[in-house]
Design a protein with these regions (language model features):
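Phosphate-group recognition and catalysis centered on beta-loop-alpha active-site segments
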Residues: 1-247
Length: 247
């Protein structure tokens, strides 16, 4: 079941190198490349017009100069917002990327990506279809460069229908005793788990299923070392350079 996915170093830049640059922006992803990180993670949701964009929150308030719900605005408007000044004046003028822009960046750099499908309420399937329409124009269905993940089982079901050979991961924030049943049904090659709910027994349980085990969000090198010693394959981190230094 384990896919032909390799993590060297075993760290994934969470929303890019988001401790060093504003999360889910091209500057954060470029910073990851500059640090020698091979994998990034980012979130995909839909703007009000249906364009898939790279953004995490349902609202604009935390990470942009805008206010209100993402779903209320077209991408043409969202593109005018400042997505960097909240982090540092050095990043003033940073824009919200589209998934298309990100896909082109992945092709140009060879960077690998964990693409988290993060649908707004009621958009589980719609988000997958829009995201797949973009990604399939740039990558083969079974590309080892791309791992799709989601907390949304309906989204994963939709993706499996659209792309039978795509590499998928089930995200778990709280422990779900039915995780194996879900993973087998959806043919997930990886389980991506909140580090706070992991212990050696649960790590063994997942690894015994012959799947990859990724853990988030790990910013402490000592904690990363512990997780690796238990058998975790890679960790998501806001400061991937610090984790990679100890790998």
């Amino acid at each position: 079941m384990i896919a032909s996915i390799h993590f060297d170093p075993p760290v994934i830049a969470h929303r890019g190198a988001s401790a060093l640059a504003p999360e889910n922006t091209m500057s954060a992803f470029l910073r990851a490349v500059q640090l020698g990180i091979k994998w990034v993670e980012f979130d995909v949701m839909l703007a009000g017009c249906g364009t898939p964009i790279i953004f995490h929150d349902e609202t604009l308030n935390r990470t942009t100069s805008g206010r209100g719900n993402v779903a209320e605005y077209s991408y043409a408007y969202l593109r005018t917002l400042d997505a960097g000044a909240w982090f540092s004046p050095l990043y003033a003028g940073e824009r919200i990327p589209s998934l298309e822009e990100m896909a082109q960046f992945l092709v140009a750099t060879g960077l690998r990506a964990n693409v988290e499908i993060k649908p707004l309420p009621g958009q589980d399937e719609q988000t997958v279809v829009a995201a797949w329409n973009v990604m399939s124009a740039y990558f083969p269905e079974d590309s080892p460069q791309i791992l799709y993940s989601s907390f949304s089982v309906p989204s994963l079901k939709c993706l499996r229908h659209l792309a039978p050979t795509s590499l998928m991961a089930l995200l778990m924030h709280e422990w779900d005793p039915k995780w194996l049943q879900i993973a087998e049904t959806l043919q997930c090659v990886s389980i991506d788990v909140n580090q706070d709910i992991l212990d050696p027994e649960r790590v063994r349980e997942i690894k015994n299923s012959k799947r990859l085990l990724l853990s988030y969000t790990v910013n402490n090198p000592d904690r990363a070392e512990q997780l690796f010693s238990w058998g975790v394959d890679a960790v998501f981190s806001d400061n991937p350079d610090q984790i990679a230094r100890f790998c």
